[in-house]
């Protein structure tokens, strides 16, 4: 049994897990499935809504391996296996009329998320439409926003192409709303409003406590300013190669960019390559094969592990031709025996090995 140094792998999504085409590369997918098979659990940590992360969680098979979704920049954590909410913080609905008033005064669009929908007063806004498309959400128009939102949202978003105006409101709210709500810009055109003291690291800390996992047993990978706190929290904090210098300086290690399989490279180096091949006891293997073809030919395993398989075969009346040359059939039997065991060693519990020929 392999003792894993790391138990939790926390991944930002956009700009980290996904390439610029918003896809998980084949190499990254293979690496992430591999580490889950090795016992490492994955957390998707994103500003996206929970619904928007579900397809990615399915692609990574988080439900099969006990992974988690940390959504809305930390406002909610759910167990991908059973949908149980493990952590949640929401905005007090009494704050919504104030947010709506400020948005209208500044000419900003306003929206929030609810299940598989976006509720907004500006359905034609290009950025809101892109957000809906990215997360596969329906847009519901509500001209009286605060009256229509009759629930406590995880977060609200103000939208404008006037970045200077957004910065001005952000600075004002950081003073005015201190202790009530937190605000930050996730994009030049987005100003996010979330419950106080919510970020990826604080929510991740709650998950670590729930799972009884130490910080030293966590790897966190991200590319943005919103990822800095979780990168600093983790035992191994990794910044993507295209990150700003302010992010890279906070990391223990800088990997390649999201266009160059940066997540796969980091995971292969930090987790997969660190697992040493463990020898498999040979006595049982050789005993089981005594009455099979390999036993009849005198083949004996001398070493078996994930890195290689070795076996010996005597040159005698069973395996040789005249003048001591090995019989082709015996050589093939030796090759098939070694390759077959190697395939079974590498096979995961949910995989099936089919017949093969090796020459």
Task: Mark where each language-model region is.
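Short active-site oxyanion
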Residues: 39-43, 65-67, 155, 216-217, ...
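Asp-based phosphoryl-transfer active-site loop
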Residues: 5-22, 99, 231
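Residue-level signal for inorganic ion chemistry
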Residues: 35, 46, 73, 156, ...
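Terminal targeting signals and extreme-terminal segments of soluble enzymes
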Residues: 273-359
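Mg2+-dependent phosphoryl-transfer enzymes with acidic/Ser/Thr/Gly-rich catalytic loops
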Residues: 4-8, 25, 192-276
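Conserved acidic, metal-coordinating active-site core of Asp-based
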Residues: 102, 106-221, 225, 230-233
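Non-catalytic pre-domain segments flanking phosphatase-related domains
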Residues: 1-13, 30-33, 37
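Active-site phosphate-binding/coordination module
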Residues: 26-127
